[in-house]
Amino acid sequence: MARYLGPKLKLSRREGTDLFLKSGVRAIESKCRNRLDVAPGQHGARKPRLSDYGSQLREKQKVRRIYGILERQFRNYYTEANRLKGNTGENLLVLLEGRLDNVVYRMGFAATRAEARQLVSHKSIVVNGRVVNIPSYQVSVDDVVTVREKSKKQARIKASLELASQREKPTWLEVDAVKMEGVFKRTPERSDLSADINEHLIVELYSK
């Protein structure tokens, strides 16, 4: 399955919520003119009642799109989450949050996860003193994530940090915006993450 390259706002409208795919320079609700609850397309205003399977599928698609992950990779994350001890749904979210591209985004070095993925792929990110260019790399507790020295002058990184300063900072991360460096202090708990995600529906979908 190819990665989606079309309009980002269309995906948010498809899921009926802000997927945080845009930089945040302008509120997505403003740009969509309060159309987030209207699906894209000619018949978008019609909202058919979803079956249980339909609701489960929509939730999976929403989370997959938030983190920018293809179907096969997402299923692999679920398999790993199911193998680990504890709640499978929560394990899944923790694995997704531990991706290097997501951590780079959460630390404020990139305005979107897609931009963070690009920074990682272009070797602009260092983990524990070593360049890592794999977006799916799993960050561990106490890992130090830094913007590579020669990349610190990039205007987009500085702009992203400015945007991040206006958002609530994740409590499981410690970030020094001046040094462009952060520490993955602890594994996030479910209460730290979005309440707008219903991971139980995803577990039900894959458990069939």
Curated annotation (Swiss-Prot):
Keyword RNA-binding in record: yes
Domain S4 RNA-binding: 98-158
InterPro entries referenced in this protein's UniProt entry, alphabetically: Ribosomal_uS4, Ribosomal_uS4_bac-type, Ribosomal_uS4_CS, Ribosomal_uS4_N, S4_RNA-bd, S4_RNA-bd_sf
One Gene Ontology biological process: ribosomal small subunit biogenesis
Entry's Gene Ontology cellular component terms: small ribosomal subunit
Gene Ontology molecular function terms on file: rRNA binding; structural constituent of ribosome
Record HAMAP family: Ribosomal_uS4_B (MF_01306_B)
Stated role: One of the primary rRNA binding proteins, it binds directly to 16S rRNA where it nucleates assembly of the body of the 30S subunit. With S5 and S12 plays an important role in translational accuracy.
Binding partners and assembly: Part of the 30S ribosomal subunit. Contacts protein S5. The interaction surface between S4 and S5 is involved in control of translational fidelity.
Protein name as it appears in the record: Small ribosomal subunit protein uS4
